[in-house]
């Protein structure tokens, strides 16, 4: 009887073994469940975020899909602490097994499955966990759950066959989702502790490894004490495995859990406007006129130029990988090396924030109690209502409700119904109750700004600020938005005069001048300068004091068409510039970036340099895919450049830019202020021998502005931002900018004499053939 029972038992065991062998064989062949092909096992389909680096080696941000913000890090760049913590906690016999730890598996089956001990530990190895992360989909039914573990075991064994232990550890840490948009160990190290993986301390590594058991349960941001308790468990495991001593464990367990939390978000961090601008440039499609509306023809024109002439524009569309597919900015793990300096970028953002916060107080005070605020009193109430109504119709809320079939009356009612919301303020985000319509008006109150700084020799853009806060004000006023430039355009008229034989020392009578415009009507510019009326003054004095009468006199001696042509030669691409006599006062719109690039010609001996944003692009393995060089063009003669340099220095030392000196900038520099009608726009352009920077400040709409010159002129609105920035840049010796650096003029140079040895041919390019046909 006993023999019969034993025989039956052995037959049963044999059958079970055969069934198990058949099941595992079927899984390996892919007959049961999902088994990835060999190619996928050898080359897992990772989605790595693209990293954006500053010139000084800092990570400015990443481009990724929302849940795949993973940045690759190699084994040699991992701290031993993270490796030791992971092995000690998740798989202490990791170096000994081939994917499945039989001892741990048996222990888990007996203690957890039979004895029902909850704290008996798991049986999964690191390799099994990796196989689950890589290839195991979620089980939707009992049958799928039944085969899920055997499938993971088979994949784990195959992974051990194709990869070294170091590679498996690296893959695991790169793959794991640590929550809070921190996918992979590199992003997690920065998100929670503000450091690189190689710099993780023991207790920090233990915290992150502790999350591997259940990231939601042990989220250190939400559950600090619970996460600390789990960290201490990991530290104890490290002590048991011999990675740390008992004394080290005790001292580390006593530490509080301190985070340096930095949530990775494209709307947060440094250079947000720049990163968004760069993203648009890199992923741009080939322009198709059919995709542009009538009011977008200027953009179509610029995109067409950039597609043909700018290798960075549409780079992901123009270039392909080895397999013939186009590069994906969000999943291919590219490394974009930009020209921005993180320190200078921080100084620029701080300068914008500090000044706008102060200026906003004056603006609120001026508009307090005004019924039409933030708009000027010159508008009628009907005009204000129409502007706000147009803003409502452009809002996301309006479009969503309209798409859902809501009537105009229903939409209007929703916009006039108070609700709880969080709004921006310079003191921090505020919770309040207001109607959506009131929120539109509220945000209109805030002044906007655009700032850019670049090296006039290399074209490297060092700082880029498109507005006060990207999270709330996403329209970029550095390179995308354009505003009227006012008097900052005058240097181009004076340049044209120098090219046509004028000298800074030529004298002109300071009286009102009347010109005949293109329609045959008289045009007499107003003039705020009441000094030396009727006296003879120099051309240099006219520019230094931004005098409209002297400007009008020069315009009377020159051709508006030639001025328009020269402006385009300086890199301004606005096709709507009208060649009228009033062109000399800057009634047309230019971006801050275009203006900064144009001004590089003055300290650079007549050579204009286009902005350079990226120096090279590498793939995930560090192979260089593309390099980029600055675009340079001689736009005026050396002689004219020297003369303009002399006059623009006088603007700062003797004229309207004198506030720069009072605010603490002592460097040799030139510059120009600019203010448009009714103080709608305030500008300041300034340059030293090694840095050209420009700033614009104004309201979202042109009818939002100061009503007085005290705070509304360019010297009050924009100049202080430039000054705050330069004081910090020149004060930071690590940047290498010397406050004592001077412009290199020829020895004994006299701008009143024309030195033929300095003369160069004025080179104004003809329009590029064929571009005009794009708009026919």
Language model feature labels by segment:
Residues 95-105, 183-186, 245-250, 498-519, ...:
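Short, well-structured active-site flanking segments
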């Amino acid at each position: 009887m006993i023999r019969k029972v034993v025989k039956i038992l052995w037959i049963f065991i044999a059958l079970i073994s055969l069934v198990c062998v058949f099941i595992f064989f079927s899984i390996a062949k892919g007959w049961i469940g999902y088994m990835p092909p060999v190619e996928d096992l050898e080359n897992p389909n990772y989605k790595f975020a693209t990293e954006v680096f500053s010139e000084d080696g800092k990570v400015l941000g990443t481009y990724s899909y929302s849940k795949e913000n993973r940045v690759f890090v190699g084994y040699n760049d991992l701290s031993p602490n993270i490796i030791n913590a992971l092995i000690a906690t998740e798989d202490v016999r990791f170096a000994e097994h081939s994917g499945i730890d039989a001892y741990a598996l048996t222990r888990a089956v007996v203690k957890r499955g039979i004895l029902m001990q909850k704290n008996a530990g798991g049986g999964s190895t690191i390799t099994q966990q990796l196989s689950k992360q890589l290839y195991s989909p979620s089980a939707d039914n009992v049958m799928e759950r039944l085969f899920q573990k055997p499938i993971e075991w088979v994949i784990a064994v195959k992974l051990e066959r194709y990869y070294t232990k170091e590679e498996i550890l690296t893959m695991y840490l790169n793959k794991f989702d640590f929550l809070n948009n921190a996918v992979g160990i590199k992003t997690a190290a920065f998100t929670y502790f503000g450091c690189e993986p190689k710099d993780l301390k023991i207790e920090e590594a233990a915290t992150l490894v502790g999350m591997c058991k259940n990231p939601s349960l042990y989220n250190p941001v939400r559950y600090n004490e619970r996460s600390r308790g789990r960290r201490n468990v990991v530290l104890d495991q490290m002590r048991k495995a011999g990675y740390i001593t008992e004394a080290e464990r005790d001292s580390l367990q006593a530490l509080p859990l301190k985070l340096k939390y930095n949530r990775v978000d494209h709307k947060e961090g440094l250079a947000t406007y720049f990163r968004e601008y760069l993203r648009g440039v890199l992923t741009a499609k080939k322009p198709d006129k059919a995709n542009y509306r009538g009011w977008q023809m200027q953009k179509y024109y610029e995109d067409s130029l950039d597609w043909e002439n700018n290798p960075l524009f549409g780079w992901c569309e123009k270039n392909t990988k080895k397999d013939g597919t186009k590069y994906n900015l969000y999943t291919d793990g590219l490394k974009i090396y930009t020209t921005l300096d993180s320190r200078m970028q921080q100084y620029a953002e701080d300068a914008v924030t500090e000044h706008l916060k102060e200026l906003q107080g004056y603006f609120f005070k001026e508009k307090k109690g005004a019924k039409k605020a933030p708009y000027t009193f010159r508008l009628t109430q009907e005009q204000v209502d129409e502007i706000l109504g147009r803003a409502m119709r452009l809002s996301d809320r309006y479009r969503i409700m309209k798409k859902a079939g809501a009537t105009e009356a229903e939409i209007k009612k929703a916009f006039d119904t108070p609700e709880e919301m969080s709004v921006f303020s310079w003191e921090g985000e505020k919770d309040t109750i207001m109607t959506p319509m009131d929120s539109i008006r509220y945000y209109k109150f805030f002044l906007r700004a655009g700032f850019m700084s670049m090296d006039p020799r290399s074209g490297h853009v060092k700082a880029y600020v498109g507005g006060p806060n990207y999270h709330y004000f996403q329209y970029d006023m550095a390179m995308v938005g354009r505003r009227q430039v006012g008097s900052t355009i005058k240097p181009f008229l004076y340049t044209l005069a120098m090219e046509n034989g004028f000298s800074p020392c030529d004298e002109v009578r300071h009286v009102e001048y009347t010109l005949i415009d293109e329609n045959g009507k008289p045009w007499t510019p107003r003039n705020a300068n009441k000094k030396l009326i009727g006296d003879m003054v120099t051309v240099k004095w006219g520019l230094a004091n931004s005098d409209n009468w002297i400007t009008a006199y020069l315009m009377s001696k020159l051709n508006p068409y030639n001025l328009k042509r020269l402006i385009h030669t300086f890199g301004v691409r606005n096709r709507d510039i009208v060649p009228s006599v009033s062109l000399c006062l800057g009634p047309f719109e230019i971006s801050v970036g275009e203006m900064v690039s144009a001004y590089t010609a003055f300290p650079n001996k007549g050579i204009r340099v286009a902005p350079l944003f990226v120096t090279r692009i590498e793939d995930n393995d560090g192979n260089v895919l593309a390099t980029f060089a600055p675009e340079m063009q001689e736009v005026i003669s050396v002689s004219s450049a020297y003369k303009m340099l002399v006059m623009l220095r006088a603007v700062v030392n003797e004229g309207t830019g004198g506030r720069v000196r009072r605010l603490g900038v002592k460097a040799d520099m030139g510059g120009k202020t600019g203010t448009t009608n009714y103080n709608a726009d305030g500008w300041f352009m300034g340059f030293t021998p090694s840095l050209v920077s420009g700033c614009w400040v104004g309201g979202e709409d042109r009818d939002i502005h100061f009503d007085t010159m005290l705070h509304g002129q360019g010297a009050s609105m924009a100049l202080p931002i430039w000054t705050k920035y330069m004081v910090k840049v020149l004060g930071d010796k690590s940047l290498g900018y010397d406050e004592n650096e001077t412009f290199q003029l020829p020895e004994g140079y006299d701008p009143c004499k024309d030195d033929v040895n300095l003369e160069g041919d004025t080179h104004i390019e003809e329009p590029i053939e064929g571009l005009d046909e794009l708009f026919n």
